[in-house]
């Protein structure tokens, strides 16, 4: 009788499947409106400083959400801004930091699609990477980065939750 009682108590435990990894994941993502507000704020900051630039905002996977180009910004600025944003999100680092920590002519700088030039800045919400912004066309990457950071500052209240 005792063995039967023990078997009955153990049956539910033995029959329960082991917990597998979740089949789905969830992640934070910027809405199109928020990404557009970010890009517009960065563009406006550059315009205020007298710079003609292109601004790209990518999601956490590096896919372009918004692309804005000032009417006098060079056509090249579109590709470079997008590349800076893509690089920031894929390297999980601001591109200025990548420039500072990688020597010229190294493999990392030659990766297809990577634009290792200052002006790409990660966008984080509540400590989670949600995308990046890239700016190109100002006279120097430090100025591109300043405009990108001004864009992020404009939406900071929506990112800190």
Positions of the model-derived regions?
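Bacterial N-terminal signal peptides
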Residues: 5-16
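Flexible, solvent-exposed loop/hinge segments and secondary-structure transition points
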Residues: 20-161
């Amino acid at each position: 009788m005792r063995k039967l009682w023990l078997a009955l108590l153990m049956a539910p435990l033995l029959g329960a499947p082991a917990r597998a990894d979740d089949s789905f994941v969830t992640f934070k993502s910027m809405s199109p409106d928020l990404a557009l507000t970010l890009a517009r704020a960065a563009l406006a900051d550059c315009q205020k400083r007298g710079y003609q630039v292109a601004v790209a905002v990518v999601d956490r996977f590096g896919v372009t959400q918004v692309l804005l180009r000032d009417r006098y910004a060079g056509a090249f600025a579109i590709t470079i801004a997008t590349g800076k944003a893509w690089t920031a999100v894929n390297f999980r680092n601001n591109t200025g930091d990548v420039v500072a920590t990688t020597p010229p002519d190294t493999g990392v700088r030659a990766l297809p699609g990577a634009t290792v030039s200052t002006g790409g800045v990660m966008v984080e919400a509540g400590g989670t990477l949600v995308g990046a912004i890239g700016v190109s066309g100002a006279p120097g990457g430090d100025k591109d980065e300043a405009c990108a950071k001004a864009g992020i500052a404009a939406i900071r209240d929506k990112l800190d939750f």
